[in-house]
Structures are given as structure tokens and as C-alpha cells.
Amino acid sequence: MTKQQQVLTKLSILLVSVITASAPAINANIPVLAKAFPSVPLAQIELLTTIPSLFLLIAILLSNWVARKIGLKQTVLVGVAITVIAGLAPIMITSFPLLMLSRAAFGFGVGLFNSLLVSIISYFFQGSERSQTLGFQSTFEGLGGVLVTFIAGQLVRFNWHMSFWAYVITVPAFVMFALFVPRIPKAQPQQKTAQQSSHLPKAIFGYLILTFIVITFYMIMGIKVPTLMVSAGYGTATSASYVILALSLGAMLGGLLFGRLFTWLKDRILIVAFTALTLAMVAIAVSNATWLTVIGGFLTGIGARLFFPWVLNAVNLEGSGNTLATSLILIAYNLAGSLSPYTALLLQNSLHIASIQNLFWLNTLVFVILAVVFAFISWRRSANVAK
């Protein structure tokens, strides 16, 4: 490829990456949708924001099989085409079941290409350029969350249908990927995958459980903040979108800081991540103003983005089965996300949590415990090294 072709290929891949983090962009629509569908239980309304995660993980399980049949590029194009249709369909949909179906399809489309983008980057770029492109991918994911959330938050002022115009970004992503990313031979990337999938890290089950717990309480924050702000009387659907926007900005900053902080702190970065998440939950729990909740959202994004790359790095370091281990972590992530509305309801009912503020105090307790546990583990390791 010429230099110009390389730039266009890289830009096209990164533009598709923008879509991967855009599903939660309509979280701020929850209060508006609850009014639009008064006969639908709130837990089902909240499921609209997390049902993409469930179908995303189903698609992740199928994506490698589909890629072997039709090729990597074609699989990505099919996935992006699905997001174009499913992302924009709610502009015209008035039926709640069809709206739920469109969100499920959107998640499925993202899942088809989400785990394949790293393979595509690894195929076209080597060495430092590969590392740099992977870093850009993380940044573009965060940028996508910021951009789509901001646009959706402004458009929801008109009506909830209009907010889905934010997904028009999927159209240029499809066109550019189709035009500027060369076709990839089927055999080569799949041979690498087969070699990488033979072993799993010994601690994989621990990583899966930890991921499930952290992402469950992280997602509870995302789905409950809009309802909290409206019910507490200090926010609207639009102001709630600023919190989701701040979360995306925090995630971008966390992603940019991760490499440098990890080099310095190693596994102690988890203490920083869980401390940030603790402070975020406290800020939201005590808040009676949009600005403080926005700060909570920003800290949530930083903490989450410091945690998740750590998990992916850990499973890639300990085993040769990078692809399989990464897929399992993504499945745990998305399963936790898709179940989070019902997990929140279960926690509220079983622990007799009467208010949403108290649910955030429970989140605080969970992240405090995790911070203390990993601080203790770090201290024990340091003590053993000193001996």
C-alpha cells in the first residue's frame, strides 16, 4: 500500500471503531421513553440501553465462524450495515417491541465486527505503528461515545425519535470501510487465531468474575443516573446526557493515561481505578446539582477505562490464547451490561433499597471493598518481594 492508502485504510478502520462505544448514547433517553411508553415497566425501558450488550456477546461468539466463511472485511461490512439500519430505524418506529428489536439488532451488528477490528489492525500494521493504531482505536471508541451522546442529547429536546439521528455516523463508516480497506485473504488471519486460541490464562475465571462484578455496577450507574436526576428534580433528559458525555470524556482520558500509569504502577493501577469509581459513586449519591453528577460521570469513565484495559492486558500476558481469552472477557463484559437493569432491580428488592441514591451508596460499598482488597494484595506482594 502507498502512504495515502495506508492513511485511508487506518482512518476507515478507526471510523468503524467510533460505532463500537455508541450503544449507550441513548441512556439519557430513559425518562423521555418512560413517558412515551407509560404502560411499559421501567426495567424494560432501561433494557433498551443494555439489550445491545446481550446480542453483542451472541455476535462475538459467531463472528469468527462468520469471518471464516465470508472473510474479515465482509463480516465487518455486514455488521456495520446492520448498525446503519438498526441505528436509524427508531426514527420511524412507534412500537416498543420493534424499538427493542432494533436495539438488539444494533448490538448484534456491533458484535460482528467488535472483536475483529484488532485482527484487522494486526494484519495491516506491524510494530510501533500497530501499537499506535490500537491506541488510536481506543481513543476513537471514546470519541464515538462522546460524539453520539452529545448529538443524541441535543436532539432529544425535540423528541426521542430525533435523538436516533445521532447514529447517522454509521453511514460514512460503512462507505469508507467498503472503499478503502483492502480485502483480506481468509486463511492468514484465521491461522493466527487458531494458534492463539489454544491456551487460556490460569486465572481466567477470576478475571471473568471480577469483570462481571465491576461492569455490573458500572452499568447500573449509566442506566440509573437519568432517572435519579429527573426524580430528584435537578435534571432533565438533556442534562442527563451531559453526564453520559462526561463519562465518555473520562473514558477517553482514562484510556490515554492507562499506558503511562500501568508502566509506573503495574497492578496497583486497580487501586487507582476503584478509588476513582468510589469517589464517582459518592459524588452521584450526595448530588443535588447537575455539575456534581457530571463530575461523578467523568470519574466513572476514568475508573472504568483504567480497569478494563488492565483485564485485557492481564489475560494477554498470562496465556497464549489471546483471542479466546479476550472474547471471554468481552462476553463477561456484555453479559453484565445486558443483565444490569434486572440486577439493579434484584438488588433493590432483596436488600430493600428504597431510593436510587441508596443504590449508589451500595455501588460505593462495592468499589470500596474492591479497592481495599487489591490494596491488600499489593501490600502482600510488596512484603513478599522485600523478604
Locations of regions flagged by a protein language model:
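Helix-to-loop junctions at the C-terminal end of transmembrane segments
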Residues: 59-72, 253-266, 348
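Extracytoplasmic gate region of multi-pass secondary transporters
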Residues: 203-245, 252
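Cytoplasmic helix-loop-helix junction between adjacent transmembrane helices
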Residues: 96, 102-141
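Helix-loop-helix hairpin linking two adjacent transmembrane segments in secondary transporters
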Residues: 127-128, 132-182
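Paired small-residue
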Residues: 86, 97-106, 291-299
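Helix-breaking motifs and short loop linkers at transmembrane-helix boundaries and internal kinks
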Residues: 39, 71, 89-98, 126, ...
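Conserved MFS/SLC helix-loop-helix module at the cytosolic interface between two early adjacent transmembrane helices
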Residues: 58-96
